[in-house]
C-alpha cells in the first residue's frame, strides 16, 4: 500500500518497496535516532490512521490549553511555561499529522517530499523545545517550593518568558545545525559529522535534560512527603509537574533503549522507529489530560467549566486551613506579580 511505501522511518526499505523513490527522498526522511533496526519490515498500514487519530486528539487538547491558559486564565509564572509547552506539543503533533496524511495517500513527487522534510524539521525542533521546557519547569518549581521566600523576592519579573524564548532559540539553533548536516548536505557531508550530531543530540537529551528534570522532581517528592507527614496538603501544581515529567520519562523509554544500544554497543535497535514516534505522540497528547485530572474536583458531581478545572490545576501555595504553615502562600505572591509576564 502507499502508506507502507512512504513511511518516513523506514528509509532503508523505501527504495526496495517503492522503486520510484529517489535517493534524495531517503535523505529527506532521515531524522533524529534514525538508526539501524532489527525489524526490516514496514509498519502495518493501520499505523498511519492511529497516528492521525492520536495527533488530532492531541491537537484538540493542546488547543484548549492554549485558549484557556492564554486568554481565559490569569497569567502566572508557571502558566507561561505550560502555554509554551502546549505550543511546542501542538506543533509537533501537527507535523506528525501532516506526515501521516501524506503517508495514507499516493503522494509522491518533489512537493510531497518537500512537505515531509519541512514537517520533520518542525517536529524535531518542537520536540526538543518541549523536552527542554521540562527541566526549566521542574527546577523553578522545586526552588519556589523549597525556598519560597528567597525565590519570590529574587525572581525577575519576566523570567518565565525569557527562559522560554531562550529555549526556543536554542532548539532552533541545534536542530538547524543537525538538519543542515544530516538532511540537506546528505552524502556530501563528511561521514562522521552526521553521526556525531546524532550522538550529541542523544547526550543532550538523555544525559542533560533528563537529570535536570528528574533531580528537582525527587527533591519535590521529598518535600511533598514531609508536608504529608505534617498533614499539610500539597499544591496541585506539584502534582502537575511530577505527572508531566513522569509521562515523558515513561514514553521515552523505547527511544532511550534504541539510542543507547545502537550508539554505545552498535546493536541494532529492537524497537521500530514508528513505535518510538508513537510514544512521543502519546507524551505530547497526554499533558492536557494531566491538567484536567489534576484540576478536577472529585467532590463536584456536576459538570464544571474547563476554565475552572484548568485554573485549579495551577493552584499553588497553602491550601485553606494551612494558614499556620510556615510556607508563604505563593498564590498571593503570584497574584502580586504583574500580568505582563506574557509569552
Curated annotation (Swiss-Prot):
Residues 1-44, 105-123, 182-198, 264-273 are extracellular. PROSITE patterns: G_PROTEIN_RECEP_F1_1, G_PROTEIN_RECEP_F1_2. InterPro entries: GPCR_Rhodpsn, GPCR_Rhodpsn_7TM, MRGPCRF, MRGPCRFAMILY. Glycans are attached at residue 4. The keyword Transmembrane helix applies. Keywords: Cell membrane, G-protein coupled receptor, Glycoprotein, Membrane, Receptor, Transducer, Transmembrane, Transmembrane helix. It is found in: Cell membrane. It comes from the Eukaryota. It is a multi-pass membrane protein. It holds the Pfam family 7tm_1. The chain crosses the membrane at residues 45-66, 83-104, 124-144, 161-181, 199-220, 242-263, 274-294. Its main location: membrane. One of its GO terms (cellular component) is nucleoplasm. Orphan receptor. May bind to a neuropeptide and may regulate nociceptor function and/or development, including the sensation or modulation of pain. This is Mas-related G-protein coupled receptor member F.
